[in-house]
């Protein structure tokens, strides 16, 4: 259940109550594709840096170790030792982005595994069954994510199919939640708005799925080739047509400036691999924007990554030392930078929540964008 606590302009401060705890929103979900954050970051680390929600990937966990294995181990929460909310995506995005060979039909999608090439089928019911086996807190509906730009006629047909798939997802989720051997029989379902960059298709689809009384709603199919201006235009068009008493999730968007702009437009949930991926390559976020620790100017820099930051890396190590670790190819380098970036993101969301609570979000947003100077 979502409770709207405060608004500052269109920015929303809320609480989302789930079977695994209350999520304070706006929130950034830390992406652990295979039930782990890449960069040697543990579930204990995630708690220390303030992570509220972990996101795992249905497609990848279905292939490795297999959702049946996870179910036999008691579900994702027990498997990875995490007692806070977990969101699993439906696998749809990976099916359409990773599979070179795929065939879309009404019942679902036939595709080849990116690991061993074997033929796999996934449709709405299969996605729900896999996510039920994983026993995540929130399951995402199975949808088709089209590339931007895509021909209007194709997008229209795709959205109609995605809507039919959503009805099938909801029916299957209700069935699974009623079974005696289901680990999490209170699993929640979010629907996904699609429609490419066509505002009218997006709006009509938002109106359609809003009637389905789902636990939350996502805006999908963005950050896949369109400009930031197009992204903001679509968010502006869609948000007013989604229920105000449900959380809104902007999928896969994680550039800090994009997060601020989306919060300003009423978005509550975010996820992205960006902080961990950047951290593994020595790109770290600071109050002044993103920096690359491999640059020669940091060789003798005795400052922490970001002065004033309370993350484990900044409290104990210098830029010079971490740069040395990267040059020496020590795994600790990646771990420290991933920890820092995840802390930066979770701390950013805490500051955003405080700014909405204090009704100064507009001023906060403008100040942060000015400080970052286009570098974050």
Curated annotation (Swiss-Prot):
Pathway recorded for this protein? tRNA modification; tRNA-queuosine biosynthesis
Query: Which keywords belong to this entry?
Result: Glycosyltransferase, Metal-binding, Queuosine biosynthesis, Transferase, tRNA processing, Zinc
Q: Which cysteine pairs are joined by S-S bonds?
A: none
Kindly list the cofactors needed: Zn(2+)
Catalytic residues (UniProt): 89, 271
Q: Which Gene3D superfamilies match?
A: Queuine tRNA-ribosyltransferase-like
Task: Cite the EC number.
Answer: 2.4.2.29
Question: Has keyword DNA-binding?
Answer: no
Family indicated by similarity: Belongs to the queuine tRNA-ribosyltransferase family.
Q: How does it assemble?
A: Homodimer. Within each dimer, one monomer is responsible for RNA recognition and catalysis, while the other monomer binds to the replacement base PreQ1.
| PANTHER family given in the database record | QUEUINE TRNA-RIBOSYLTRANSFERASE
HAMAP family in the cross-refs: Q_tRNA_Tgt
Biological role: Catalyzes the base-exchange of a guanine (G) residue with the queuine precursor 7-aminomethyl-7-deazaguanine (PreQ1) at position 34 (anticodon wobble position) in tRNAs with GU(N) anticodons (tRNA-Asp, -Asn, -His and -Tyr). Catalysis occurs through a double-displacement mechanism. The nucleophile active site attacks the C1' of nucleotide 34 to detach the guanine base from the RNA, forming a covalent enzyme-RNA intermediate. The proton acceptor active site deprotonates the incoming PreQ1, allowing a nucleophilic attack on the C1' of the ribose to form the product.
Q: What is this protein called?
A: Queuine tRNA-ribosyltransferase
Q: What is the lineage of its organism?
A: Bacteria, Bacillati, Bacillota, Clostridia, Eubacteriales
